[in-house]
């Protein structure tokens, strides 16, 4: 949210309670997402627990790589193991509605040419809206090894398990939200459901040719199982 909020020309839009939806320079997209440069266009909410930085490109995608939308693209760069470093970090967050979030980031040095990193998170979703709840789990182990002084291999696996209540918001009248219904959900608590389970394998070989040139080869294998159903009020 904050990443997009403070990026000029980029806004969020309604993702119908189950997916990221970004507006690049007035063009709405649910598919122009990338992870480590590889396309990630499955419709779901992406977590940032294992993300080092987010890159946002604005302008026609065809100018860069041929396929995609006309407004721009969003690329998430994942955290990689750091050679020669041992570190551990954990955080816990709670709010007044009873929601909580737990994250951990472990980096382990395994010798001069190898390191291992594990990122994991678990959160429980709650807010002021009727029936709203959800649970999300994710973990991402990554192994890095130096094949030579200029070549590095990263092997990564990520597992995602996400279930949440679908809240499509409140109805409108005269092109405005009906504020009196701020806490009321116009839906079916047993029918408004979204689930996604995913396994993502990634392999990346990076090579430094010179001080000004480097290249990488990435291979990704993804398996997603998603279910989405809901009822909602269109108007009042």
Model regions and ranges:
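Short intrinsically disordered, low-complexity coil segments enriched in acidic
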Residues: 1-7, 119, 192-193, 236
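Glycine-rich, histidine-containing beta strand-loop boundary motifs that form or position
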Residues: 16, 35, 58, 120, ...
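Residue-level recognition of beta-strand termini and adjacent short loop/turns
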Residues: 4, 16, 111, 146-148, ...
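Outer-membrane beta-barrel translocator/receptor signature
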Residues: 49-52, 63-141, 147-153
């Amino acid at each position: 949210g904050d990443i997009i909020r403070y990026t000029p020309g980029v806004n969020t839009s309604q993702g119908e309670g189950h997916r990221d939806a970004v507006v690049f320079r007035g063009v709405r997209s649910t598919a122009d997402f990338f992870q480590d440069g590889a396309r990630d266009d499955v419709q779901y909410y992406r977590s940032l627990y294992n993300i080092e930085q987010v890159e946002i490109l604005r302008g026609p995608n065809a100018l860069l790589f041929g396929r995609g939308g006309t407004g721009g693209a969003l690329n998430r760069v994942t955290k990689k193991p750091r050679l020669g470093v041992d570190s551990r970090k954990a955080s816990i967050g709670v709010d007044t509605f009873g929601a909580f979030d737990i994250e951990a980031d472990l980096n382990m040095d395994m010798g001069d040419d190898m390191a291992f990193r594990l990122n994991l998170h678990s959160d429980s979703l709650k807010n002021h809206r009727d029936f709203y709840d959800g649970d999300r789990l994710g973990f991402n182990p990554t192994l890095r090894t130096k094949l030579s002084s200029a070549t590095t291999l990263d092997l990564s696996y990520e597992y995602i398990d996400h279930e949440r209540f679908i809240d499509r918001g409140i109805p409108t009248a005269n092109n405005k939200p009906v504020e009196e219904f701020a806490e009321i959900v116009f839906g079916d608590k047993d029918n408004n459901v979204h689930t996604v389970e995913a396994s993502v394998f990634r392999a990346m070989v990076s090579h430094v040719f010179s001080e000004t040139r480097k290249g990488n080869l990435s291979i990704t294998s993804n398996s997603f199982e998603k279910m989405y159903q809901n009822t909602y009020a269109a108007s009042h």
